[in-house]
């Protein structure tokens, strides 16, 4: 399995096994004693009280589904190698979730989005937050932005590089999926912000979102710093990824069609967009980059 995975994915899976799966199932003893009930109990435990970071509560459905998938893959390998006669986890199923948005997800209105952007004025994360809201970028895409991806002459911004965190920080010339690569128009607000950053950029780095000495922002700094500024300004607690959700909900609320929202967010399929944003639909007029510009003007 190692040869088929990207480094960051492999490292994340290693964490799942070492922190969660192996410690839990060690109590079972011999692998031949493992039953479907053991696996089901593990799933239920992780959903309700299975965090390993000292916080209360369970893991998300998405994360636990990854755990189950890894367990099934590992046990399939055990069958192939002759350690066990059959895979006891094959009969364990999880209810399919049709929504990527949960009750904890915060969807900002356009006015609320402005308040969030204003709260970060003068803060190192100002550009990260602005870019995430305007273009619906993922954290990895925001951190992966290089000056070479900005063309002030053509007025374009390209998404073609990411920075992710596994056991180490990894920068790579690839995106989450092939459809994640994109070219956006630089709206006036973003163009002005980037020009100002470019004038005072550190000379020893090619990345945009960095410290004054050129060091790249760590992904976990973005997460924690984002939460801290929201709290200090009395704003509602939300995840950095909720900015991406908010981008589409704002556009969809203004009349963007489902297909256009899919293209802007660069989802693989329209079902993903529909599952997340269908409840935000109110209008049906076509919006383009000019509308994005109008929404995010000063």
What is the meaning of each model-derived region?
Residues 144-150, 262-268, 278:
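A short, basic/aromatic helix-end/turn motif that makes direct DNA contacts
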Residues 154, 165-192, 212-213, 254, ...:
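C-terminal secondary-structure termini that scaffold catalytic or DNA-interacting sites
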Residues 53, 118-125, 135, 184, ...:
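Short, basic (Lys/Arg/His-rich) helix/loop patches that form interaction surfaces
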Residues 56-61, 65-69, 80-145, 153, ...:
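Basic, Lys/Arg- and aromatic-enriched nucleic-acid-binding interface segment
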Residues 1-57:
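Basic/aromatic-enriched alpha-helical hairpins
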Residues 18, 72-75, 79, 281, ...:
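C-terminal flanking helix
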Residues 98-99, 163, 265-290:
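Catalytic-site neighborhood detector that most strongly recognizes the C-terminal catalytic loop/helix
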Residues 6-9, 13, 35, 63, ...:
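Hydrophobic (often cysteine-bearing) scaffold residues that line and stabilize catalytic clefts
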């Amino acid at each position: 399995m190692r040869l088929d995975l990207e480094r960051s994915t492999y490292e994340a899976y290693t964490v799942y096994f070492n922190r969660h799966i192996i410690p839990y199932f060690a109590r079972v003893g011999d692998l031949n004693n493992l039953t479907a009930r053991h696996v089901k109990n593990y799933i239920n435990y992780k959903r309700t009280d299975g965090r390993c970071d000292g916080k209360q509560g369970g893991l998300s459905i998405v994360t636990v589904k990854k755990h189950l998938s890894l367990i099934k893959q590992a046990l399939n390998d055990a069958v192939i190698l002759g350690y066990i006669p059959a895979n006891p986890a094959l009969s364990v199923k999880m209810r399919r979730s049709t929504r990527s948005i949960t009750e904890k997800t915060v969807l900002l209105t356009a006015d609320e989005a402005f308040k969030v952007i204003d709260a970060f004025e003068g803060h190192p994360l100002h550009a990260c937050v602005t870019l995430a809201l305007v273009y619906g970028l993922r954290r990895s895409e925001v951190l992966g932005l290089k000056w070479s991806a900005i063309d002030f002459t053509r007025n374009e911004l390209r998404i073609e590089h990411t920075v992710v965190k596994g056991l180490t920080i990894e920068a790579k010339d690839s995106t989450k999926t092939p459809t994640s690569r994109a070219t956006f128009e630089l709206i006036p607000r973003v163009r002005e912000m980037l020009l100002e950053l470019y004038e005072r950029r550190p000379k020893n780095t090619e990345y945009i979102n960095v410290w004054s000495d050129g060091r790249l922002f760590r992904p976990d700094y973005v997460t924690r710093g984002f939460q801290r500024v929201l709290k200090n300004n009395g704003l509602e607690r939300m995840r950095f990824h909720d900015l991406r959700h908010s981008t589409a909900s704002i556009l969809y609320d203004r009349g963007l069609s489902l297909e256009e929202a899919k293209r802007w967010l660069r989802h693989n399929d329209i079902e993903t967009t529909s599952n997340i944003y269908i409840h935000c639909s109110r209008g049906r007029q076509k919006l383009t980059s000019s509308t994005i510009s109008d929404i995010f003007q000063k």
